[in-house]
Amino acid sequence: MAHMQKKGIKVSGRLEKDNLTVYTRCGKIIMRSATSEMPRSRTREQFISRQRVARNSNLWKALRASGNCLFAGGSTAYARYCSLMRKMPEVFMTKEMYRNGGTLLLPGMPVSDGILPDIGYQWGEVEGAGAIVTSIRVSTPLSLNPTGTDMVRALCGRNGYWKVGDTLRLYTLVQTVENMIPKVYVRMEEALLAPGDSVWRFANLEPRAVEGRLALVGNTLADRNRGWALVHRREDRSSSQGVLTRCTMYEPYTTEIALLQAAESYGGLTGQPFLTPGKG
């Protein structure tokens, strides 16, 4: 309350009137005027940049949920990941989608970055069935035993850059839609190249030899909403690998209509009139 006195105004408590607030602090009268601020600038370029940040952040969280992320740089690993993601298609999702963990499976998206030689892989066929054919050399035919493949003999014996103690890591990425929100889930499996641990640990993919190269065969490869990546790991070092996928669910999110719908969910763009998608 404010009270009139002979020597001025006595203020006790807090007085608010319109956009003016008056209160005391340490024996002094503080007056503050509240003014309305313009909403944060959201030009087209700024909005695309912020969408990119949200895209990278959610996909990074999905990768981390599968295990430790193999990106060089230690504390700067996320920055390196974001740098590699610049090559990926721009996708636009609404505020609600990103707030609820929305993610999209992108062809070639990075899962690792390091100094070890990359593993090459591409789509192929084995006896009429779909396969992922890699650049990893193996003996032909590929020897199998009841518990799996002798990984040490198959990989280390034919590839000079593979050593006992290395691991072959398989990432499986699955694109789903939950409550109208697209989400990517990542599963990681590892096979250790050690004489006493020669079990083939990739449950859904069977190893085959194709012209002296390791190929992976399995019914799940026909699923167009999945993606795979193989990574060579040695302690804290790894190869640089991206995702092989036929998934196209991301494509509608790359359009101008998707951009405008996403922008509308954030309050629209500044610096240009907003047009409702589909209307002139």
Per-segment meaning from a language model:
Residues 1-126:
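Long, polar/Ser/Thr-enriched low-complexity segments
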